[in-house]
Amino acid sequence: MPTELDKIFLILAIVEFIIGLLGNVFIGLVNCSEGIKNQKVFSADFILTCLAISTIGQLLVILFDSFLVGLASHLYTTYRLGKLVILLWHMTNHLTTWLATCLSIFYFFKIAHFPHSLFLWLRWRMNGMIVMLRTLSLFLLIFDSLVLKLFIDISLNIIDKSNLTLYFDESKTLYDKLSILKTLLSLTSFIPFSLSLTSLLFLFLSLVRHTRNLKLSSLGSRDSSTEAHRRAMKMVMSFLFLFIVHFFSLQVANWIFFMSWNNKYIKFVMLALNAFPSCHSFILILGNSKLRQTAVRLLSHLRNYTKTSNPLPL
């Protein structure tokens, strides 16, 4: 029977799933309809759509994993179902993280303004750089999947033993291999994190500098461009905050699983880890004028529909 902690965990996991699903389905539908209507797909819309599709897949895996952890955690080792779930989660998380990284870099070169020659040279070759990053992410996905498969096989073999401490004492070499594999997984996940962190921080600095210049101009602080830049800064910092929480939660989750796979605190780490795929879509909607305007129109239609379908009694 699930405990009270398990029930709370499942409720929060379902809420995260619904929030993330609504936001990403909305992004996918709007961009697909716009692409069909205009017979043209822009680079930002393409990356956004791919990110939404990848996140939807990740959310489905997360929901299944949450039910598995909350209701039948023993299946992770009894039927080796956990191996498949972990691999699927890792693949979808890898794609989502790298697509978010590509989007961060794309916005950085599109919005930021730096007079440095290296920045101008990279901006000129931005499309080729995005393609190169996607190719690199696919190679790293294959490498990570092989490393993770070996890591899971060794971990599950250790868990199958009746005495974990005794098994570690007798198999120090195997424990060292696990440490090496865990380090490799952490290093490969650090690559997209460092790229996103760098691009978002430089984008934020560029927006701050541009906003300061607008304040000093004759337009005044109430200029619409200034307000737009302030809103963009808030969106960038919110996205960056979620990305940082996601990265460090991933490292903590890997460490907890490495030390004790059935630790009760893993549930809380999973909730923090899943906040990024659940909430980042709404940050993207608020930061994108087309998506934001479409969302406002949709909410207005829904509000009018509820008023007409439920008229006030006389």
Curated annotation (Swiss-Prot):
Record: glycosylation sites: N163
Topological domains, Cytoplasmic: 29-50, 123-127, 209-238, 287-314
GO CC entries: plasma membrane
Membrane topology: Multi-pass membrane protein
Broad class of the protein's primary localization: membrane
Residues exposed to the Extracellular side: 1-7, 72-101, 149-187, 260-265
InterPro entries associated with the record: GPCR_Rhodpsn_7TM, TAS2R
Pfam short name (any one): TAS2R
Subcellular location: Membrane
Residue ranges of the TM segments: 8-28, 51-71, 102-122, 128-148, 188-208, 239-259, 266-286
Keywords: G-protein coupled receptor, Glycoprotein, Membrane, Receptor, Sensory transduction, Taste, Transducer, Transmembrane, Transmembrane helix
Gene3D superfamilies on file: Rhodopsin 7-helix transmembrane proteins (1.20.1070.10)
Example of a GO MF term: G protein-coupled receptor activity
Other known facts: Most taste cells may be activated by a limited number of bitter compounds; individual taste cells can discriminate among bitter stimuli.
Role, per record: Receptor that may play a role in the perception of bitterness and is gustducin-linked. May play a role in sensing the chemical composition of the gastrointestinal content. The activity of this receptor may stimulate alpha gustducin, mediate PLC-beta-2 activation and lead to the gating of TRPM5.
Family according to the record: Belongs to the G-protein coupled receptor T2R family.
Protein name: Taste receptor type 2 member 42
Source organism: Pongo pygmaeus
Gene behind this protein: TAS2R42
